[in-house]
Amino acid sequence: MKIDVLTIFPEMFTGPMDVSIIGRAREKGILSFNAHDVRAYTTNKHRRVDDTPFGGGAGMVMNAQPFFDALAAILGPRELRDPLRSRVVLLTPQGAVFSQAKARELSGLQQLVLICGRYEGIDDRVRQAWVDEEISIGDYVLTGGELPAMVVIDAVVRLLPGALGDETSAEEESFSDGLLEYPQYTKPALFRGMEAPPELLSGHHAAIRRWRRKEAFKRTYQNRPELLIGRPLPFDDQVLLAEALRELGLDAEIPEKPKKKRAKGREPRT
């Protein structure tokens, strides 16, 4: 996968893109990353990238010209671009809130271009002409789009095949299936009077899976209950959710397993 970032502070990406999972993905050739300095595409003498807003108001607005030229250099002519293979994303508070589902969607692209704004934003003609979608990482204001871009990159890269040492890690993390992740423990089993759950020490794989699933329901209900609203659950999960709620001190009825319907036209054996 190729990821390009447009920013006036490319040096902000030097450390985070060189270490841990992202750094290893680059070393393996799984990820190609470039941070492009928007100032390099300016045509004015002083390499200015901003000007006062039309209509007045506080702050400065980033010019369209350097972004247009940078995007054309990276992606080629607008009219020839295939949005199914590459996508241009503007990081902005006005965008849709980023999610694990969106990260998985973006990880299937060949190329992702992230635009980092500053000041009062970017001339809207950039959005109209080039941007495929707008993404926000939450309902709060940051100084620029660089930190949100790093969040998106981290979430996307870890989903690329081969990026993680254990491919099951991404499948079991929070939000991978709409639930928060279960609690984790490691050695020693007894630490300062606090014991690790016996289920995790039993060696019984089915019991471990059941405990983890139930704890995921507990944690989700306690911290993000909205994730459970309207969620269709198979019967086994319905039982685990009810047990989890009971263990939290709530009144929940354990569902009974539905009886199989007898096929029509067949008489019961005597």
Swiss-Prot record:
GO MF annotation, one: tRNA (guanine(37)-N1)-methyltransferase activity
E.C. numbers: 2.1.1.228
Gene3D superfamilies reported for this sequence: 3.40.1280.10, tRNA(m1g37)methyltransferase, domain 2
Binding-site list for S-adenosyl-L-methionine: 117, 137-142
The reaction(s) this protein catalyses: guanosine(37) in tRNA + S-adenosyl-L-methionine = N(1)-methylguanosine(37) in tRNA + S-adenosyl-L-homocysteine + H(+)
Compartment(s): Cytoplasm
This protein's record includes keyword Aminoacyl-tRNA synthetase: no
InterPro entries, per the entry: Alpha/beta_knot_MTases (IPR029028), tRNA_m1G_MeTrfase_C_sf (IPR023148), tRNA_m1G_MeTrfase_TrmD (IPR002649), tRNA_m1G_MTases_N (IPR029026), tRNA_MeTrfase_TRMD/TRM10 (IPR016009)
Pfam families (UniProt xref): tRNA_m1G_MT (PF01746)
Keywords, alphabetical: Cytoplasm, Methyltransferase, S-adenosyl-L-methionine, Transferase, tRNA processing
GO cellular component assignments: cytosol
Stored CDD domains: TrmD-like
Family: Belongs to the RNA methyltransferase TrmD family.
Subunit structure: Homodimer.
NCBIfam families linked to this entry: PRK00026.1, trmD
Job of this protein: Specifically methylates guanosine-37 in various tRNAs.
Name of the protein in its database record: tRNA (guanine-N(1)-)-methyltransferase
Lineage of origin: Bacteria, Bacillati, Bacillota, Clostridia, Eubacteriales
